[in-house]
Design a protein with these regions (language model features):
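Short acidic/polar active-site loop segments enriched in Thr and Asp
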Residues: 54, 105, 126
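ANL superfamily adenylate-forming
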Residues: 115-173
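Conserved ATP-dependent adenylate/AMP-binding module captured primarily in the ANL superfamily
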Residues: 88-120, 165
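Conserved AMP-binding/adenylate-forming core of the ANL superfamily
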Residues: 22-66, 70, 74, 91-96, ...
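Structured binding elements
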Residues: 80
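AMP-dependent adenylate-forming
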Residues: 9-33, 138
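Conserved AMP-binding
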Residues: 63-66, 87, 96, 170, ...
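Short beta->alpha connector loops at strand-helix junctions that form conserved
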Residues: 86-88, 132
Length: 178
């Protein structure tokens, strides 16, 4: 039986395998190292903090499994939020229902799926992000997600002045933010 916390296992894996390949999209030569994945997770954690996400908030993800799908998943669970994975084969009406019924506040989706969804039917969603590059596809009125993302590299520099390093990987709920 594993005596460690599930999240701590990931934390240790990121540190111990920093320069090794972690995720690769099928059929593509580019890979993310564990260190690059950890840095992407840190960026999403900064975004979550900026948007005042709390432990237990729900984040939906729908799209073909790829590296960014995994990064969104990992960022969500290591932040303490709840992931709501949705099968990409569901029709738009079912997706609207699942997202609303789950009370998700963020949605990560493929661009092709987003083209078939109606933002006005996603009543509780504060922002929608592309699984292609994490750009903001939609934000609710009054949200500042797009503005924040334009300056994410500066926020990373401000938060991690020595650069994001192995030592900065700390996945105890809501604690990766300094």
């Amino acid at each position: 039986m594993i005596k460690e916390n599930f999240i701590k296992l990931y934390e240790n894996s990121f540190r111990e395998n920093w320069d090794l390949p972690c995720y690769t999209n099928y059929g593509e030569p580019e890979s993310y190292t564990y260190g690059e994945v950890a840095e992407e997770i840190a960026k999403l954690h900064l975004l979550f903090k900026h948007c005042s996400l709390r432990r237990g908030d729900k984040i939906a993800v729908i799209g073909k499994n790829n590296a960014r799908w995994c990064i969104a998943y990992m960022a969500t669970i290591t932040y303490g939020a709840i992931i709501v994975p949705i099968l990409q084969d569901f029709n738009p009406n079912d997706v609207h229902h699942i997202v609303n019924h789950s009370e998700s506040v963020f949605l990560f989706t493929s661009d092709t799926i987003w083209e078939n969804l109606e933002e006005e039917r996603l009543t509780g969603i504060r922002a929608v992000f592309s699984l292609t590059d994490f750009r903001c596809l939609h934000q609710r009125d009054g949200e500042t997600v797009q503005k924040f993302l334009k300056h994410i590299d500066q926020y990373m520099t401000d938060t991690y002045p020595k650069g994001f390093r192995k030592e900065d990987v700390l996945y105890t709920t809501l604690s990766t933010i300094r």
